[in-house]
C-alpha cells in the first residue's frame, strides 16, 4: 500500500510516527508555547529528533513544553527554545541571524505559529496583524535561513481550509481601503502561506529542498480565543457545504494530536516528491488551487512589502 494511503483524518502524531527513528534530525518548529506547536514538538522529540522550538514568550514556552522535554529525554531527543516574535521584523532578523551564526543545518522547518480572526491591529512594523504574523513573519524568517536547509530538507507551512475565505490582496494588505473583516484577513494570510510553500518549492527543489502547505483540521486550541464559538460553527458549516458540493467529506472536530498529525506526516513520513509544492490535509495530498502567475505574483509582492518595510 502506498504510504499516502495509510493514514487519514483520525490519525494521531504518534500513530503517524510509529516506528520512526528521528535521531540525528534537527527540526525547527515555530509557536511551541501552545496547542499544535507543543504537540508537534513533543511527537518529534519523542521519536528522537532535536527540536528547536521558537516562541515569543519564552517563559510561557518553558512551562508549556515540560512534557516535551520529558518525552524527549526518554527517546534520545532534545528541545531547545529560541526567542521569536513573528510580528516584529527586528526580532525575526535577530533570531535568523543567531541561527545562521550557529551554522547548524535543519532537516525540517515547520512554520506552525499563527493567530486567527484577531481584532484589527498592526504588527510592530505596521502590517495588518494576521497577514504580518501568519505569513510575512515566516516569509522573512524562512528566506533568511534558507541556506540552513540542505539537500533532503523540507519546509512545512501551516495553512488552513480558511484559505477559502479570501485570495491575497497585496494592493490593500493593511485594509486601508477595505472594511476589516477578521476571517477575510485570516483567509488572506492562509492563502499566502500556501502560495509561499509552492513558490519556495519551485525555487529550491533543484537543490533537493521541498516545501508543502498543510491544513491541520478544525481543532479547539488557543488559536480561536478571539472568536465566538457560534461564529466558528457557521464558518465550518459553510466550508462543509462547499466540500459536500465537491463530493468531499465534511469537517469533523479533531483532537490536538490528530490536528498535528498532518504536519509530522509531511515533515518525515510522506515521500518528498509526493508532497513537494502541494497542499495537504488529513495526511493526504490535496488539490492544486493556484496557477503559476498567482504564485509568482504573490511571492514577488511580499518581497516588495519587506523591502518597503526596511526603508521606513
Language model segments and positions:
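Active-site rim elements
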Residues: 181-187, 247-253, 292-300
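Short, amphipathic alpha-helical "lid/cap" segments that border enzyme active or binding sites
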Residues: 93-96, 256-267, 299-310
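SDR active-site lid
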Residues: 202-292
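Generic hydrophobic secondary-structure packing signal
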Residues: 37, 57-60, 189, 255-262, ...
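Generic low-polarity alpha-helical segments
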Residues: 2, 92, 131, 241, ...
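Conserved C-terminal active-site "lid" loop/helix of NAD(P)H-dependent oxidoreductases
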Residues: 278-312
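Rossmann-fold NAD(P)H-dependent dehydrogenase/reductase core
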Residues: 2-232
